[in-house]
Amino acid sequence: MSQASVEIVKEFFAANRFFVLGDEDILFIRNSLARESAGSPGFVIPSDEITLIKNGVVKVISWHTMKFTPAVLNKNPEIFDFVAGSYRHIVKKTFMEENFSRILVIPALPSSENLRIDSIKIMKEKGIDGVITFPSLIAGLIDKIEARQVYLSSVNEVLRILKFYRFFVEKEQILPF
């Protein structure tokens, strides 16, 4: 587990107005502003759809050099420990019988369409409701950071400084003509 990766994920959810509780690499998230009628995100959740989630248990997997192929998922069953096991009791207490999503934050899915489909199938079979990739999550956090605002969080402050000095490429404007 990388504490830096967990902190980035915490800040992403906090920037999107979630309440966040942490227990090592497991986060419990609650979005009191979520509307039931807004729908739900797909399995691969883009950062701009994260606010559709009301409650969630999030496991941060910071194996940044790996893509989550079927082989990786099958060789590492501990990835799915948070779905069952000792966390069940904590989840029931935290969400008081309300529905919640089981979400993995992972570096990447396979590039190959067949491997991607197989990986998603395995994760669904193991009880995962959605995944967020680190590139999407980090881009979403950077979008929320204001270059001229000071942040108490060291993660956000580092991102703010990098954004201020234009280390991140601005999105290209698309003109209507």
Predicted regions and their residues:
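Acidic-basic catalytic patches of nuclease active cores, encompassing PD-(D/E)XK
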Residues: 1-37, 50
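Catalytic cores of nucleic-acid endonucleases
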Residues: 15, 49-140
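Ordered hydrophobic segments in well-structured contexts
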Residues: 19, 44, 55-57
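Surface-exposed beta-strand edges and their flanking turn/coil or helix-capping segments
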Residues: 35, 70-73, 145-147
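Short acidic loop-to-beta-strand element that houses the catalytic metal-binding Asp/Glu
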Residues: 38-48
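Short secondary-structure transition/capping segments
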Residues: 55-57, 63-64, 144-157
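Charged phosphate-binding loop/patch that engages nucleotide di/tri-phosphates or the phosphate backbone
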Residues: 147-177
